[in-house]
UniProtKB/Swiss-Prot annotation:
The species this protein was found in: Arabidopsis thaliana
Residue range covered by the transit peptide: 1-72
Location within or outside the cell: Mitochondrion
Organism classification: Eukaryota, Viridiplantae, Streptophyta, Embryophyta, Tracheophyta
Organism domain of life: Eukaryota
Family: Belongs to the PPR family. P subfamily.
Name of this chain's protein: Pentatricopeptide repeat-containing protein At1g11630, mitochondrial
GO annotation, cellular component aspect: mitochondrion
UniProtKB keywords: Mitochondrion, Repeat, Transit peptide
Ranges for the PPR repeats: 74-108, 110-144, 145-180, 181-215, 216-250, 251-285, 286-320, 321-355, 356-386
Length: 405
């Protein structure tokens, strides 16, 4: 009997487990379908917004979609809507969108909703509303934490109001009993560096030390960037020594900051010498390193060096991104090397990366001028297939091409 009972019990457990798996599988499929439906709706909304300038219509589109700041595409939707409204000077509509967004959230309201609104007000250059939203969090029954403080500092950065950022940093933590964290200090270092007061960032590092918060490579990277812009190279070396003292690894990301600064100052050869020195110390550059150098040499119209770096990059197993291709194609067209530009353009389009209409037109006309009309028409055909909205423009370009010889 005991044996039969165990068999029946096992059969019962197996049956229940099977039912649970089926139910769980059904639930997962339902969740996946819901997520897919949400993604499609959000992407359709984003597509609509990109072609809309009417403030009432923008508000209507946003309100008709259940937007969440926790979802990446929805954050883009809010950014596009706010930037468009601010560009057209529809500031009242910006307030209606963001304030309504917070107020209409179900209770308990999440701080993440307010954080997004604070940042977007800064992006719209409506910093007073960022501050007001931060101060009014109790009215919305939203907890105020260091996340809101960091969002307010970021809003100041976006509005480029460095004086207000300094006031927020000095006053708000004491006023609201908020303890700054690593992100707070890094934001303040960035404020000082962007405002041309990088030397003052040493005091922030000292404050971090007092609070037992260790600066990171990102903290020191901001300072290096700031000192490079101010051409204080002795200070750059000082920061590098500080990194060693704090036990912070000087990795390729730190060198990339220096390379970017040198390339922006039209010193790409110096940047390349720097990375050659790094490689001799057995530190490998990454794809960002090569992209920065390629962009730098292109901006100095040194195509030979740019193409050489591109070849080295690919041979070393790194994958160029779309911007790397676009930069090279533009510079090759500018230098009159349409044949090489065509090779890179084909590679780029195989990855579904198509340069801008103006660059593509430049390339097409350049090929035609070199008696490569067939190649030009082939390129037009591929672009027309991928981007149907520009078909009429490409038909005009194609009609103006000379007949093949």
């Amino acid at each position: 009997m005991a044996f039969l009972f165990r068999i029946r019990t096992s059969e019962f457990i197996l049956q229940k487990a099977t039912q649970f798996r089926l139910k769980s599988s059904s639930s997962s499929i339902f969740t996946l379908k819901s997520l897919t439906s949400k993604q499609k709706k959000s992407r359709d909304t984003l597509s609509l917004l990109k072609s809309e300038n009417n403030p009432d219509r923008i508000l209507e589109i946003c309100r008709s979609t259940s937007l969440s700041p926790d979802y990446h595409v929805d954050r883009i939707i809010f950014s596009v809507a706010v930037v468009t409204l601010a560009r057209e000077k529809h500031f009242v509509a910006v307030s209606q969108l963001l304030d309504g967004f917070i107020q209409n959230q179900p209770d308990p309201k999440s701080e993440s909703f307010a954080v997004r609104a604070i940042i977007l007000y800064g992006r719209a250059n409506m910093l007073d509303r960022s501050i007001q939203t931060f101060r009014n969090l109790e009215q919305y029954e939203i907890p105020r934490t260091v996340k809101s403080l960091n969002a307010l500092l970021f809003a100041c950065l976006m509005a480029k109001d460095y004086k207000e950022a300094n006031r927020v940093y000095l006053e708000m933590p004491k006023m609201y009993g908020i303890e700054p964290d690593l992100e707070t200090y890094n934001r303040m270092i960035r404020v000082l560096c962007e405002s041309g007061s990088t030397s003052s960032s040493y005091s922030i590092v000292a404050e971090m030390e007092r609070k037992w918060i260790k600066p990171t490579a990102a903290s020191f990277g901001l300072m290096i960037d700031g000192f490079y812009k101010e051409e204080k190279f002795d200070e750059v070396r000082k920061v590098m020594r500080m990194m060693d003292e704090f036990g912070v690894h000087v990795g390729v990301a730190t060198y990339n900051i220096m390379i970017q600064c040198l390339c922006k100052r039209k010193k790409s050869a110096e940047a390349k010498a720097l990375i050659d020195g790094v490689m001799s110390c057995r530190m490998r550059p990454n794809s960002v390193t090569y992209s920065l150098l390629i962009h730098g040499f292109c901006s100095e119209e040194n195509l030979d060096e740019a193409m050489n770096l591109f070849e080295v990059m690919v041979c070393n197993g790194y994958k160029p991104d779309s911007e790397c291709y676009f930069t090279l194609i533009h510079c090759l067209c500018k230098g009159g090397d349409f044949e090489t530009a065509l090779i890179l353009c084909r590679e780029s389009m195989e990855k579904n990366w198509v340069p801008s209409f103006s660059v593509m037109k430049w390339l097409v006309n350049g090929l035609a001028s070199r008696s490569k009309v067939d190649e030009a028409k082939e390129l037009i055909a591929v672009v027309k297939e991928k981007f149907t909205r520009n078909v009429d423009l490409w038909n005009e370009v194609e009609a103006a091409l000379p007949l093949p010889q």
